[in-house]
Amino acid sequence: LLETAKDCVRDKVMVDGRASGALVEAEQTAAHGLAWLATYVEALAQMQVWAEKLLADSKFGEVEQLIHQIAFGEYLGQLYGGIPMNQGEILRLQDIGLTQDQMRMMMEPSVKAVTQHANTQAARLRLVDLMQERSAEVTVGATGLDEELDMIREQFRRYAVEKVEPFAHEWHLKDQLIPMSVIDELAEMGVFGLTIPEEYGGLGLSKASMCVVSEELSRGYIVVGSLGTRTEIAAELIIAGGTEEQKQKLLPAFASSEKP
């Protein structure tokens, strides 16, 4: 399905073997929709990797099975029926250029079975029941992550409970900025340099570490959870396209939360 969609968009935006900026602009619904489609496909692929890893480790229990089947049922249903890119924009496969015959090819018997029987009300209710029973657990089901990431999760979960949750509501009601004391503490814990290479003052950890940290801080207050993503985005752009002088000047400053 994805390869067919890529071919359709190529036909719309390529000129002499290269993407035309003007055509991408003119066909932005198809181009944007292709990005969403590719994201959905990759999300399901990674969901399957997660499930197979847990199965091999004998950790694929009822909660994990329900998460797996609900995710596949929902996303496959959206791929065929329409991807909600926002509240008022639904991406249909025909918007990318697929024909009705090409769309129907997706609905082979196994896909039909999943879309009809996986994401049911009974499955969702059972998952919610299990989530309530296990509300003391930090995550819903096994994450499949390594021990280092689990340790990072626990560290930032404790920080969020102690230093963020008790004050978050007041910050919100008073429309206050996050206190500098919190930002300084996060900097000391390495939040702003998680994925920045060590030679530039960062910790050189994986993108998964940034996701784990953001998740746990967001449990306390979503604004705090988003702080580290700002330097993450800026650092990635500088690493990919900046000069060595820019990297030497900016990346260590990001990692330490100091002014360059």
Language-model features: where?
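FAD-binding core of flavoproteins
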Residues: 1, 6, 106, 115-119, ...
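Extended amphipathic alpha-helical segments enriched in small hydrophobics
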Residues: 1-55
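Generic structural signal for well-ordered, non-transmembrane alpha-helical segments
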Residues: 3, 32-35, 39-42, 66, ...
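Short, solvent-exposed segments of well-ordered alpha helices
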Residues: 18-38, 59, 63-70, 143, ...
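Short glycine/serine- and small hydrophobic-enriched flexible loop segments
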Residues: 36-39, 46-52, 74-77, 215-219, ...
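Short secondary-structure subsegments characteristic of cysteine-rich extracellular domains
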Residues: 44-75
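Intrinsic disorder at enzyme termini
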Residues: 74-158
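Glycine-rich flavin
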Residues: 89, 158, 165-260
